[in-house]
């Protein structure tokens, strides 16, 4: 789409009074969502949104505007308006003549737009039917299907003109169970960057069974006695801890502003020698994967922590330029209405050599976490608190009775240092990460982990 505009005139106007960089970002997104609640299809929404964002950076300040009018005159007028924030002489424009299409790590075999609404409604009906069939104690079921087909083009001075297509599919199911002792909830989700073929791996009935089972088991669960104790995080728990307690602190903008516990730790030990962490946008099919980020930088695998030593941060183009380092492909934005900022993609603690069964057997008494819930993190201090959505007592090296209402508190670098067993498995989670009012799709992953002395605090 951008190739159809007079980019030379637009960029010449944008940079007519100077600027370190200028950018045009085009986005077109088609979305469809289906919501089923209380046994009824409540909503089927389909729509398309498109627009162009324009960015000017002058003396390290960012000026941003956007328009839904894709006509060349409208974009040129907006570029002229932004140029008024600069003061100085013009900048010679250097751009390729046409965009380079990114090599996407998740090629789509069956675009979801080629399948009918009835098939998509049947997916949520299946989740509702399976969840309710698990037990009469299942009181409520909320099931959703979502898809998005996103096309982006990025023209970035100096020297970048790139394009990408990204397809997302997602199923979620939430179950509420109840008896005389109260109400409990179970939640499960599945999907990623894939077309309709995602159903080869993500089975609606299986998601519903897991969500209903989690809610039902919680009905008979008891609270655990609090205190410091060994904690085993199953790979099934997903990477909530690495994303929240570690990943945000490694986004370069937070570190640069002094808002990260890791701000002065590059090259120093921040965790156990058993811990290595990467951020990887190139993993096929995962929710945080892409061919290019929202500044036109290729998606890549970035080493963050190697054998417990902090090796790097996550950069967008602007911060990388300020610090004299290469961008890491982490400049992301929610839409054309937003400026890009450093964000995670798929953040992963790499697998080790211990079997999950061996790790569990190594603990006499403690807490075994199968699913993490929500939580809070102070990125400045590294302190965190997470809820446990599904947990069990560890009794004599075995999974014991379920617990409810448990929390885990600790500190990011201290917790990484407590990891003394790392499993040879790997489990992925997915979600939408919020930061500065923007939500972007992300993935996270971890193997089974054991947190040893001085132990996390369980509440």
Regions found by a protein language model. Give the residues of each.
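N-terminal small-residue-enriched
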Residues: 1-459
